[in-house]
């Protein structure tokens, strides 16, 4: 087992540009808008607004409060509940999703409710976590102002449904999937036995006409737990466009050899439960994957287990692998790549480079070339002691 490590981190941060990080999107996001979980599909998390600064931040007061009404005793559920949503703001409306799958549109200036779409999550099911980190949006250039679903709100629910909602009315788009919904449990390599073993807790990323979605898979349940495919669906129709397996299934894939014996065909997880990023101009989507099943024992999945615990670039239009960089080999520590990738431009070695930044649970920050996955900042592989657990290596 080996752990990849990073050198010269402080130098990268010192050399990072002070202007907004990330390449400009094809359609720049206005400063007053926040169109994705991380501001934009690049995950830049930068706002150019200047009204609040060091001279007045201490005098800020609450302007309004909105109550979702989902705390006990008003609502009872099985399992934990937490509001983790980052709202998006687009076209003068704020959109968010609650732990129980209620998508809400608010006036961002007053907090007045404009509409609510209730996905009607079964509250008797003990999901691992009742949570959702946000929603995504897409503007259909083929539809005129005032037409239904000109702008869509895309949401993935904890019970693994993909919803396409008219941003103006809160109604499901009837031309998407089955009456506005795609069942994400259909078509999995390892289908979960229980609903709570396969969930959606992060917003999908919408790029170049497709909705790309990962999944949250129950940890430490069984070797052949729910599989962690990353899939893309047509943003208009909901039709499946492609599937990528983070546990490789094709013997011709070079990564297949890093799973010894029959392990690749039965092992689950290695899923991407965090938020994805995208570079529309390069037709790339960046996928941070987690550990394979089970998390803390690798005797049933010997080898480096490549594509698990990786940051992987896929062609957004086809799902084809472009490159993959593994941050931990043969993970037995649950070192998922839990942070969303950030697409930035860094100054290093006397020149500016378009990069992907991936922060990890180990406290390391990997700085990779956006087109090749090669480390921009040198990475040193450090040997660690061999395991003494029976069956491990």
Regions found by a protein language model. Name each.
Residues 34-38, 79-100, 127-161, 196-222, ...:
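Repeat-blade elements of multi-bladed beta-propeller folds
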């Amino acid at each position: 087992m080996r752990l990849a490590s990073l050198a010269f981190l402080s130098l990268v941060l010192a050399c990072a540009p002070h202007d907004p990080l990330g390449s400009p999107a094809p359609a720049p996001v206005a400063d007053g808008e926040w169109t994705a979980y991380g501001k934009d599909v690049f995950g830049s998390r930068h706002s150019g607004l200047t009204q609040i600064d060091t001279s007045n931040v201490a005098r800020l007061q609450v302007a309004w409060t909105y109550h979702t009404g989902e705390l006990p005793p008003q609502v009872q559920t099985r399992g934990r509940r937490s509001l983790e949503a980052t709202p998006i703001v687009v076209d003068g409306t704020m959109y968010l999703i609650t732990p129980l799958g209620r998508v809400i549109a608010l006036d961002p200036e007053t907090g007045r409710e404009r509409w609510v779409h209730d996905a009607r999550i079964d509250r008797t099911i003990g999901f691992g976590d009742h949570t959702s980190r946000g929603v995504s949006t897409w503007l259909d250039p083929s539809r005129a102002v005032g037409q239904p679903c000109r702008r869509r709100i895309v949401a993935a629910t904890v019970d693994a449904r993909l919803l396409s909602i008219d941003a103006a009315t809160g109604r499901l788009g009837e031309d998407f999937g089955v009456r506005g919904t795609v069942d994400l449990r259909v078509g999995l390599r390892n289908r979960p036995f229980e609903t709570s073993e396969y969930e959606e807790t992060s917003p999908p990323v919408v790029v170049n006409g497709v909705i790309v979605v990962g999944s949250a898979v129950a940890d430490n349940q069984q070797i052949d737990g729910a599989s962690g495919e990353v899939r893309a669906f047509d943003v208009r129709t909901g039709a499946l466009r492609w599937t990528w397996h983070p546990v490789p299934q094709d013997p011709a894939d070079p990564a297949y050899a890093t799973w010894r014996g029959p392990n690749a065909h039965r092992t689950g997880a290695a899923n991407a439960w965090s938020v994805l990023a995208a570079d529309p101009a390069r037709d790339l989507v960046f996928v941070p994957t987690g550990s394979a099943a089970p998390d803390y024992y690798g005797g049933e999945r010997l080898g480096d287990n490549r594509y698990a615990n990786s940051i992987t670039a896929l062609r957004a239009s086809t799902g084809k692998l472009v490159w993959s960089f593994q941050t931990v080999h043969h993970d037995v520590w649950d070192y998922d790549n839990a942070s969303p990738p950030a697409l930035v431009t860094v100054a290093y070695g006397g020149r500016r480079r378009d990069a992907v930044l991936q922060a990890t649970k180990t406290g390391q920050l990997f700085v990779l070339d956006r087109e090749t996955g090669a480390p921009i900042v040198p990475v040193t592989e450090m040997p660690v002691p061999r395991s003494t657990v029976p069956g491990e290596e």
